[in-house]
Structures are given as C-alpha cells and as structure tokens.
Amino acid sequence: MRQAAEQARIEGADSDKGMRSGSKKMALLGSVYTIDPYLRTPDDVLDALFRQPQASTEQPSNRPKPCFKHVRAALMRDVAGSTTPQVETIFGWMAQEVSERAMAAQRPLVLLMDGQESLWNAGLEYLPEQHFEVAEILDLLHAVSYIWKAAHLFHPSGSGAALRFVRKQVKRILLGEVERVIRSLRRMATRRELSKNRLEDLEQICGYLRNNASRMAYDEYLAAGYPIASGVIEGACRTVVNDRMERSGMS
C-alpha cells in the first residue's frame, strides 16, 4: 500500500482554494492479495537487486504468485484539501477485504508500505493488532532509495564507489543491522567533514532509518517467507492511475 508514484492530473480545480488547473495530486493505492511464504536469504535479495541488466530476469519456478489480488485507488480530498477521505476509503476497503478472507485465523497479515507515518497510523486504526497478527514491513525499495541518497553525499553519482557503498549498506540492512548502518553513516560524515547542508541531509536519512527501524527486520521477514517489496503496487501505479483515472477524464 502506498502513495502512487505516477501522479494523476486534476483539471478545473477550484482556483479560490489556491489550486490551479492542471496541478497534480497524489493518489493512494492499496492492494490485498494472498500468497504462500517464500523463503529467501539476504544474499538472494542482494543478488537480485544488483543483478546486471543483461542477466536473466526469469523468476524461480518455485516462487509463489499472488492469488485473489484486488487493487483499489482513491484520489479524494475534503473541502480543506486534506487527504483523509482517500485514506479512510482505502484502509476501510482493505480491512473489509481481509475480514472477508478470514485471514486473521489462517495466516499473518503483512502490511507493506512506504515510510509515511500517517499511513502506518491508519494501519493501526483499521487493522488493529488485537484482531490481526500484523507484520509491519517498510518497502525495501524505499529504504534502498535513502541509501542511494546517502551514497551521493559521499561519492559522485554514477560512480563505482557509490555502487559499492550502496551494496554494502543494503546488505547490512537485509541482515537486520539498521542501527549499524546509521552509526556507519555518521562516522563517515565526521571523517569526511561534510558541509552543513550535507550533514542536514544525512540527518534526515538517519532519522528516516531510525523511525522505521522496527519495520526493517528484513532478516526475520525473509526467514518467515514474507514479501518485502511492493512490486504489486508498482504495477498498479501504471495500470490504475495512468490508465483508468486518465480515461475517466481526470487528465
């Protein structure tokens, strides 16, 4: 579940509220599906992330596929411009989907999202742990994007040094060593004597990692066979938001 990477344009917004025609708003997408556990190791994931483009991208034959996948998108605001209506719509729908599947009695519920705190709070409200065995997981690809930002504070963009830096830190994250990554970044900042602006950027990165550390026990998630990245939603961002919303006259 995540904010859509592809933004749907809204035409004819009320200019009295400061919105101009053609300005963009962020849709919220949710997906509910059932999938069998798939055990991997940190090295399995690391190899997949850093595989060369020309290498085979075929999925292992024993990898389970999502079943009964339902996707829903909402692009809604109240009169004050708040996104609360779309959050209520998507999380209410997901809670109903989960209840209808009787998943609570059969298997754990994985809540896989980006790092937006308001979405995690909504998850607690609509999918409370007293009713569901919830495993909160930060989408690995969002965590990796922050490691790339950190790499570019120390190394030139596109350099081999930046790539090696990212691979090293991502492996630590996959091993469940988030605090070690944070300490390493801060030590490097001290040694490299980063500028004030870069230090501020680094603290934002470290803050993101620390705030989400409880959702980054990837070594445990992999051993349990849980999904750790929202590829299902990445596809939905393209098909639901770009295709269906734009066809309905929203562009």
Place the predicted regions along the sequence by residue.
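Catalytic center-proximal scaffold of phosphoryl-transfer enzymes
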Residues: 1-251
